[in-house]
């Protein structure tokens, strides 16, 4: 038996923050910006309440900051030298003729089985699990290509505070709390190294007004949290397309929302409004997923994962003044043996360039 419908995460908080930010942006003077002068702050919120369910990947939130364009990573003076110094040891990202960015992120994800009413272990469904992490990314880009390497580190298990966060939010909103968190994965430090390459091979000749573009991506990750190879693409059609690298879900690989050229609507005073629809697809060959395979060094609940997993997104994005607001409906194929349906969740992203 399932519990009464419950909801995870801080949807009301995110909505309030979005309204406050947009109000503040509308009041700002329209001073011209440039990628070399402007940082980008991004808030992402994902929840299956948008898909009318409350299980599997049930909630995710991430906040991040991306530096202005830099000639060298060491110019990111907002970060300590030991962080930017890591770039000298990483491949693929110090491409001549490119601009560089450094980004930091903090996020949390929650996973639960379908049956959240029972305290007993649900052996044929995914484990309860949480993931609290920080990320440091290094990006090398032109207007048509982006290479990123991200280092993520954090905690799985009770130390992720996923149960505590869910209990707090559900208590505040009067929802039932899933009863089986005593069966969650054990505490385990997590570490992952992620590389992704994005390219814009096709776009319309118009850089303003009606237009389209296609953005492809490919990459992979290695670590005890997840190890995979991935590839996919995104199609965007609309008015005054942002000069960035598309809209993505909360997943590793660095932020793609920062403007990459001066003709981005968020930087160009002549075109401060834009709107577009988009569709994206991503496929992954999954070799390791701790949220399905269970703890690395401890005996824990696990299920037999699917090695091939895909995501399909449909969404709309609006740029106004210095803000970009995107919403996507995501459909994820079955991730393990016995999962009875495709998983549907919503993804809301607000990026602010300043």
Language model segments and positions:
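Sequence/structural signature of outer-membrane beta-barrel proteins
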Residues: 46-50, 111-115, 156-160, 200-204, ...
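Long, hydrophobic/aromatic-enriched structural stretches that serve as scaffold segments
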Residues: 86-162
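Short loop/turn motifs that connect adjacent beta-strands in outer-membrane beta-barrel proteins
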Residues: 30-38, 69-100, 141-148, 201-214, ...
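Residue-level signature of outer-membrane beta-barrel architecture
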Residues: 65-67, 108, 138-140, 197-201, ...
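Extracellular loop and loop/strand-boundary signature of outer-membrane beta-barrel proteins
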Residues: 119-123, 178-183, 219, 298-302, ...
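Residues that define the transmembrane beta-barrel architecture of outer-membrane proteins
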Residues: 55-61, 100, 128-132, 147, ...
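Transmembrane beta-barrel strands of outer-membrane/channel proteins
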Residues: 41-47, 102-110, 151-157, 197, ...
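Outer membrane beta-barrel transmembrane domains
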Residues: 114-116, 234, 240-354
